[in-house]
């Protein structure tokens, strides 16, 4: 007998016990839930309830907040643009608009704010519409080639 043959003859999945089908089946009447109480009711799982103990979300302090006015940018690397140009998915590299980026799935919507980052390298001359650019990408894009 080998370790990998220990469970070879056993069924892969045990059939679940059928509940609430009479007293003779062993799990009839209350179906293993006992009598009354919170856990006997349907939809019983109370999120965050720890049996009367102070829940974790009230024990821990509140931390920070999300500013409604903060600009949230979708990130596009110049390496990804170059890959799409090489694969001929971007035909006119001199005019890469937000609409085209959304169409190619780089950003979720043409209304999204776009930030260009410098990961990768550009071989083709490009014209990109964007809202922000990193220093590294700025150096690569504003070269004589880029």
Curated annotation (Swiss-Prot):
Biological role: Binds to the 23S rRNA.
Subunit details: Part of the 50S ribosomal subunit.
Any one GO MF annotation of this record: structural constituent of ribosome
Region (Disordered): 18-45
Entry keyword set: Ribonucleoprotein, Ribosomal protein, RNA-binding, rRNA-binding
Entry's Gene Ontology cellular component terms: large ribosomal subunit
PANTHER family for this protein: 50S RIBOSOMAL PROTEIN L15, LARGE RIBOSOMAL SUBUNIT PROTEIN UL15M
Entry superkingdom: Bacteria
Gene3D superfamilies in alphabetical order: 3.100.10.10
InterPro entries xrefs: Ribosomal_uL15, Ribosomal_uL15/eL18, Ribosomal_uL15/eL18_sf, Ribosomal_uL15_bac-type
UniProt key word Protein biosynthesis: no
Phylogenetic lineage: Bacteria, Pseudomonadati, Pseudomonadota, Alphaproteobacteria, Rickettsiales
Protein name, per record: Large ribosomal subunit protein uL15
Compositionally biased residues, Basic residues: 30-39
Stated family: Belongs to the universal ribosomal protein uL15 family.
GO biological process: translation
């Amino acid at each position: 007998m080998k370790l990998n043959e220990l469970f070879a003859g056993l069924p892969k999945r045990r059939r679940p016990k059928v509940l609430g089908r009479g007293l003779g089946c062993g799990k009839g009447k209350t179906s293993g839930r006992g009598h009354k109480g919170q856990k006997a009711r349907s939809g019983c799982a109370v999120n965050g309830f720890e049996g009367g103990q102070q829940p974790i979300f009230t024990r821990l302090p509140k931390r920070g907040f999300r500013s409604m006015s903060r600009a949230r940018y979708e990130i596009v690397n110049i390496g990804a643009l170059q890959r799409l140009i090489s694969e001929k998915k971007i035909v006119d590299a001199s005019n890469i608009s937000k609409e085209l980026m959304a169409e190619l799935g780089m950003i979720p919507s043409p209304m999204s704010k776009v930030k260009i980052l410098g990961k990768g390298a550009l071989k083709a001359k490009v014209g990109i519409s964007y809202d922000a650019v990193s220093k590294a990408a700025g150096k690569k894009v504003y070269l004589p080639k880029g």
